[in-house]
């Protein structure tokens, strides 16, 4: 087992839902049952300085198109009850429910030139927004955009001087000089590229301006 991706989000009762992927590289030597434990879901409770945790679920299909192989990044969308799971061996994003059921939806099949890596979600209100999926490359990354609600492909953008990206993160909260939030990408395991979300709104207003 090799813990890799993690996503943490608050629930309605003030606890934390934590989803962790198991990216085991020795795929051919795994018994089939191991694929059923590719994702772990914990509940964390924080009380003062104390943290308690409970394992809620372990899951992953063991047969069929929803079977999870080399899983890396993971990201939850509670409003739509979806988990986006990057499967590097199959070069796709597989969509599960937060309860651990495969939805039958596979995104970006045939679209990744490199490896599917970091995932981020740009929200427009409770239901709308844009998914960002990293297409890792040693030359130049590509970032594929999908509609949050319909899961339809929208378009792809690149970032100059940013390569070999694994993790990404996006916040829409104003932070200092980043008035609309910030988009961060790991750059070739050396540093972090930082982009003002305002740049997205200027370059792709039809996607990132929530007011239309």
Place the predicted regions along the sequence by residue:
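Sequence/structural signature of beta-propeller domains
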Residues: 1-212
């Amino acid at each position: 087992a090799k813990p890799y991706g993690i996503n943490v989000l608050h629930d309605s009762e003030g606890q934390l839902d934590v989803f962790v992927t198991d990216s085991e590289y020795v795929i051919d030597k795994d018994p089939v049952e191991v694929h059923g434990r590719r994702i772990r879901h914990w509940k964390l409770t924080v009380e003062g300085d104390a943290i308690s945790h409970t394992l809620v679920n372990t899951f992953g299909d063991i047969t069929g198109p929803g079977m999870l192989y080399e899983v890396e990044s993971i990201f939850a969308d509670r409003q739509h009850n979806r988990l986006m799971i990057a499967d590097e061996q199959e070069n796709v994003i597989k969509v599960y429910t937060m309860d651990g059921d495969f939805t039958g939806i596979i995104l970006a099949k045939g679209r990744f030139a490199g490896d599917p890596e970091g995932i981020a979600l740009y929200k427009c209100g409770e239901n709308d927004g844009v998914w960002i999926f990293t297409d890792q490359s040693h030359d130049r990354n590509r970032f594929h955009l999908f509609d949050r609600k319909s899961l339809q492909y929208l378009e792809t953008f690149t970032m100059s001087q940013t390569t070999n990206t694994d993790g990404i993160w996006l916040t829409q909260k104003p932070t200092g000089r980043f008035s609309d939030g910030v988009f961060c990408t790991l750059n070739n395991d050396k540093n972090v590229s930082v982009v003002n979300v305002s740049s997205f709104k200027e370059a792709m207003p039809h996607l990132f301006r929530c007011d239309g």
